[in-house]
């Protein structure tokens, strides 16, 4: 079943009270909220214990075999330790934590209030209401990394100071004690906009003593969907709204001496397509809130352990051409254009047991010019090919997405080759109404 289908099914089972097991190496942000709360793991697919957990559950529930899994925590997750920001990690230090229910019964909320002139204050009782405005450049988001990292590094978010120049930033004093959060932080904002279509991007970062800022979690909202996606409606410019965002679930430890940072921006390109025109948000400080799901460390967490991961034998393969993975930000100061180039080239791999060569390459470009929000442009080139002896086949797909104030413009081309002869080709050109996007 496709990933999103599995998550929708898991969410329905949770709502009906049906027992099920969810096991995953990663959580795709923003999808399958009920199921997302139930599973998490620290590494890529190569380090996950999914098969062993599923086997133990099936043995216990379907076959009546005593596997011990029913005495284990209902939920286990990897509580990440603080690390300096970088676009790739060899490992993420931390520890396993477990809960007997979700949401956990002993979870406590810790509330922070954004205050003038940029302070994030814990448990504020009475503070002055002030209006602070933000209108972000399209560069806000260039260093955000991939929507869902697939370990094709360097695709993780970089030092968030690169992003904070285009954001409204609130930073807490240094923590006097370590803080652990587990779950989905929420943000409630009193805001108004000067345009009928606008978006807000919110990031929570771990600010280290040397001022490096590592993104912990984030959330995006098209403000025309402020009351849900079933019936979006334009904003009334100048009218204040109470808007709530749920950030992506996370398990994170903030050491003493570190600071929390809440960053608010009005664009997050290219993770989110920008609105039709630049919009300014007016945020009311003193009444807006950041609520963190605070979890106290427990000695029982030390007893959570897994056997070494098991898997099928690795197939024999030979790397015929060198793979190349990179992300590059290119600034053309003369033309005032910025481009994010993503290179995901796996090269050519040979599988001797099958006498088969496999070639995979994906290139992506995301660009814009100045503050022209309708200059945003996303382009992809994907190639896939197989070769055995004198026989070879490959496909090439090119996709280009641009926009006007009223429509998205999609241009796509598919070519299929057998040897050097093109055996199939198709082209698409479509205009799609933006519909408050």
Locate predicted features.
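Short beta-strand/loop motif that positions the catalytic acidic residue
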Residues: 2-5
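Alpha-helix capping and helix-loop boundary segments enriched in small/acidic/polar residues
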Residues: 8, 12, 42-48
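Short alpha-helix in the alpha/beta-hydrolase fold that links the catalytic acid
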Residues: 13-27
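Catalytic histidine neighborhood in serine/cysteine hydrolases
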Residues: 26-41
């Amino acid at each position: 079943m496709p990933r999103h289908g599995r998550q929708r099914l898991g969410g329905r089972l949770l709502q009906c009270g049906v027992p099920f097991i969810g096991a995953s190496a990663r959580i795709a942000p923003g999808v399958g909220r009920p199921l997302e709360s139930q599973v998490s793991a620290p590494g890529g697919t190569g380090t996950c214990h999914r098969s062993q957990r599923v086997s133990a559950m099936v043995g216990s529930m379907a076959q009546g075999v005593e596997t011990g899994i029913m005495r284990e925590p209902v939920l286990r997750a990897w509580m990440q330790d603080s690390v300096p920001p970088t676009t790739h990690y060899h490992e993420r230090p931390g520890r396993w934590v477990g809960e007997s229910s979700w949401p956990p019964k002993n979870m406590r909320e810790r509330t922070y209030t954004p205050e003038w002139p940029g302070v994030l204050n814990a448990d504020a009782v009475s503070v002055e209401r002030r209006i602070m405005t933000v209108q972000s450049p399209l560069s806000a988001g260039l260093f955000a990394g991939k929507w869902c990292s697939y370990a094709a590094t360097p695709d993780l978010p970089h030092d968030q100071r690169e992003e904070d120049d285009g954001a409204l930033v609130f930073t807490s004093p240094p923590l006097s004690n370590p803080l652990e959060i587990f779950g989905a932080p929420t943000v409630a904002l009193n805001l108004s906009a000067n345009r009928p279509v606008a978006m807000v991007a919110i990031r929570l970062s771990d600010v280290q003593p040397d001022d490096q800022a590592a993104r912990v979690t984030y959330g995006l909202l098209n403000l025309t969907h402020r009351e849900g996606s079933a019936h979006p409606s334009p904003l009334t410019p100048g009218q204040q709204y109470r808007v709530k965002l749920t950030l992506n679930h996370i398990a994170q430890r903030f050491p003493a001496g570190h600071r929390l940072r809440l960053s608010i921006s009005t664009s997050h390109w290219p993770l989110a397509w920008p609105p039709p025109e630049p919009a300014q948000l007016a945020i009311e400080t003193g009444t807006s809130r950041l609520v963190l799901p605070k979890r106290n460390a427990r000695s029982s967490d030390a007893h959570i352990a897994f056997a070494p991961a098991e898997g099928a034998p690795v197939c024999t393969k030979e790397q015929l051409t060198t793979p190349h993975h990179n992300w590059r930000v290119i600034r053309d100061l003369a033309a005032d254009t910025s481009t994010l180039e993503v290179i995901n080239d796996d090269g050519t791999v040979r599988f001797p047991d099958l006498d088969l060569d496999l070639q995979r390459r994906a290139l992506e470009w995301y660009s814009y010019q100045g503050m022209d929000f309708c200059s945003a442009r996303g382009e992809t080139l994907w190639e896939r090919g197989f070769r055995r002896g004198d026989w070879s086949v490959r496909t090439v797909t090119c996709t280009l997405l641009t926009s006007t104030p009223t429509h998205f413009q999609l241009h796509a081309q598919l070519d299929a080759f057998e040897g050097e002869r093109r055996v199939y080709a198709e082209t698409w050109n479509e205009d799609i109404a933006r519909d408050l996007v």
